[in-house]
Swiss-Prot record:
Keyword hit for Hydrolase: yes
Active site: D69, E128
GO molecular function terms listed in the Swiss-Prot or TrEMBL record: N-acetyldiaminopimelate deacetylase activity
Record-level GO BP terms: diaminopimelate biosynthetic process; lysine biosynthetic process via diaminopimelate
Signal peptide: none
Domain of life: Bacteria
Family note: Belongs to the peptidase M20A family. N-acetyldiaminopimelate deacetylase subfamily.
Originating organism: Streptococcus pneumoniae (strain CGSP14)
Protein name: N-acetyldiaminopimelate deacetylase
HAMAP family in the record: DapEL
């Protein structure tokens, strides 16, 4: 039987960033091959650093998918754990070591007997940086294994062990990276009339773009436009010719995301025109679409967990954080949910360390749900 804690600790020590998960893939394949030995209803495919494990059903009517992400983050770990990261500047600070371990535990249970319906276990790379789910889908990695329904989870530090939270609508926002560069004309601070100050134009943009959320977004829906980087100039007495802004757009529906993206671009171009200068606007959403749960499937999952002993189900509000599972859920109906891990430190914090007792709880809960779906 798979030692969940040992497995998690082994994975925790080898975090790798997206599309570089070579050791992680090798470790996972070793475990998967041991678990599936002698199971003639199992097939395994790899795609770059990703893995697909397909359990052929005995009387299949559909394919049920379970997705887990496998990449780490470019963070220096500060947990002080004896099994801390062995990769300098890399850490499983988003709980993907837990996600992988739970998926392996569920795979082990699913292999106890051939399911009626097909089951697909997806070990997906590059959730954090390259939208690996989109890359796999667009490259045809699923082939005829593409699920009819897709499920997945994400650990959440501010929920207690035993708590599962989701809803029947949007769980994660869609995110879009924004880069804007204003191009004016440099000059000496003493002669502003001979220059065209990009810093001033960019400053006007930062204040004016706030009107997008306050005046273009339905307040019931909500959206976020935040610029965390503003770079302009090198010294106090020189007017800069360029100003660079780097920010993010967050929205709970794709339609709203596209509206906000359009308005941000329009405001930037309007400011540039008013100051008689050029502007470059780069909007990069890629595969980070809103994670929109299928209402009927979400209600089914919530009802199932609500009746499970040891599980406290929470109907939770959406989060403005992003998750690339949204892309796959835009192609296949499915559900994502939060799993409580009770950590005082947030996701992506260098001291984030979940409680390991959640591993057994997660495996028991998810495997029982997948068993139900596979038998329908």
């Amino acid at each position: 039987m798979l030692d969940l804690i040992q497995t998690r600790r082994a994975l925790h020590q080898i975090p790798e960033i997206g599309l570089e998960e070579f050791k992680t893939q090798a470790y996972l394949l070793d475990v998967i091959e041991k678990l599936t030995t002698g199971k003639d209803f199992v097939q395994i495919r790899t795609w770059r650093t990703g893995i697909l494990v397909y359990l052929q059903g005995s009387q299949p009517e559909r394919t049920i998918g379970w997705r887990t992400d496998i990449d780490g983050l470019p963070i220096v770990e500060q947990t002080g754990l004896p099994f801390a990261s062995q990769h300098q500047g890399r850490m499983h600070a988003c709980g993907h070591d837990f996600h992988m371990t739970i998926a392996l535990g569920c795979l082990e249970r699913a292999l106890e007997e051939q399911p009626k319906n097909n089951l697909l276990f997806l070990f997906q790379p590059a959730e954090e940086n390259e939208a690996g789910g989109m890359l796999m889908y667009e490259d045809g990695a699923f082939g005829d294994w593409l699920p009819n329904q897709f499920y997945g989870l994400h650990v959440r530090p501010d929920l207690k062990v035993g708590q599962i939270a989701t809803n029947t609508h949007t769980l994660f926002a869609g995110t879009c990276e924004v880069k804007i560069r204003f191009k004016g004309k440099g000059g000496h601070a003493a002669f502003p009339h001979e220059a065209n100050d990009a810093l001033v134009a960019a400053s006007y943009f930062v204040t004016q773009v706030q009107s997008v959320v306050s005046r273009n977004v339905n307040p019931i829906e909500g959206a976020v436009v935040t610029f965390g980087v503003f770079q302009a100039g090198t010294t106090n007495n020189v007017i800069t010719d360029t100003a660079f802004l780097h920010g993010t757009i967050r929205a709970l529906t794709q339609d709203m995301s596209l509206l906000v993206q359009k308005r941000v671009k329009t405001v930037a171009e309007g400011v540039a025109a008013a100051f008689d200068m050029e502007v470059e606007v780069e909007l990069k959403q890629g595969g980070y679409l809103p994670v929109e749960n299928n209402p009927a499937l979400a209600r089914e999952l919530m009802d199932f967990f609500d009746e499970k002993d040891g599980i406290e189900l929470i109907d939770i509000e959406p989060a403005m954080t992003g998750e690339d599972f949204g892309y796959l859920l835009s192609k296949v109906d499915g559900v994502m949910f939060w799993l409580g891990i009770d950590s005082p430190y947030a996701l992506h914090h260098p001291q984030m360390s979940p409680k390991e007792e959640v591993l057994a709880i997660g495996v028991a809960a998810v495997s029982s749900f997948l068993k139900k779906k596979a038998a329908e």
